């Protein structure tokens, strides 16, 4: 499932004018008269819903919160082979949450972990734990190593 940000082709930090510009552009390029391939599937209602949600500050805040929660439920305890490895020390701690800006899309504090998430970590052979987490703004997954204090 792609995010509303991906539907409109904007970053999570996009301003209202940027959202409006992206919305107009996406509608124009997705219009059935503008598409050469008649079998191409155009989801104009999805574009409209994405814009309506993101342009309203209250809806956007709620949507962002849902994105974070759904990302956390996607399964953290996988092998992690081939993923970039970060230490929990690389994260900022604030209000019972560890966060880090994404190294790929640079979305601010888009990789988040809570104490509950860390309790689900997988023990490693070095006496620590590993957990796999996804950026809330793009498809990047990283492996986070940490130790109990």
Curated annotation (Swiss-Prot):
PROSITE patterns: DNAJ_2 (PS50076), DPH_MB (PS51074)
Keywords: Cytoplasm, Iron, Metal-binding, Nucleus, Zinc
Compartments in which it is found: Cytoplasm; Nucleus
Any Pfam family hit: DnaJ
Gene Ontology biological process terms in this record: protein histidyl modification to diphthamide
Binding of Zn(2+), residues: 102, 105, 135, 138
SMART domains in the cross-refs: DnaJ (SM00271)
InterPro entries documented for this protein: DnaJ_domain, DPH3/4-like, DPH_MB_dom, DPH_MB_sf, J_dom_sf
Molecular functions per Gene Ontology: metal ion binding
One GO CC term on file: cytoplasm
Residue ranges of every copy of the DPH-type MB domain listed in the record: 82-147
J domain: residues covered: 3-67
Involved pathway(s): Protein modification; peptidyl-diphthamide biosynthesis
Family per record: Belongs to the DPH4 family.
Biological role: Required for the first step of diphthamide biosynthesis, the transfer of 3-amino-3-carboxypropyl from S-adenosyl-L-methionine to a histidine residue. Diphthamide is a post-translational modification of histidine which occurs in elongation factor 2.
Domain remarks: The DPH-type metal-binding (MB) domain can bind either zinc or iron ions.
Protein name: Diphthamide biosynthesis protein 4
Lineage of the organism: Eukaryota, Fungi, Dikarya, Ascomycota, Saccharomycotina
């Amino acid at each position: 499932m792609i995010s509303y940000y991906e539907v409109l082709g904007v970053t999570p930090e996009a301003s209202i004018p940027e959202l409006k510009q992206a919305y107009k552009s996406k509608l124009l390029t997705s219009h059935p008269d503008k598409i050469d391939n008649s079998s191409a599937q155009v989801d104009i209602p999805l574009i409209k819903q994405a814009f309506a949600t993101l342009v309203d500050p209250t809806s956007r805040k709620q949507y962002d919160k849902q994105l974070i929660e759904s990302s956390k439920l996607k399964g953290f305890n996988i092998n992690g082979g081939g993923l970039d490895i970060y230490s929990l020390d690389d994260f900022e701690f604030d209000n019972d949450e560890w966060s880090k800006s994404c190294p790929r899309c640079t979305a601010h504090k888009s990789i988040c972990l809570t104490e509950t998430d860390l309790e689900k970590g997988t023990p490693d052979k070095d006496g620590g734990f590993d957990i796999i987490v996804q950026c809330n703004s793009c498809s990047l997954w990283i492996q986070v190593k940490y130790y109990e204090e």
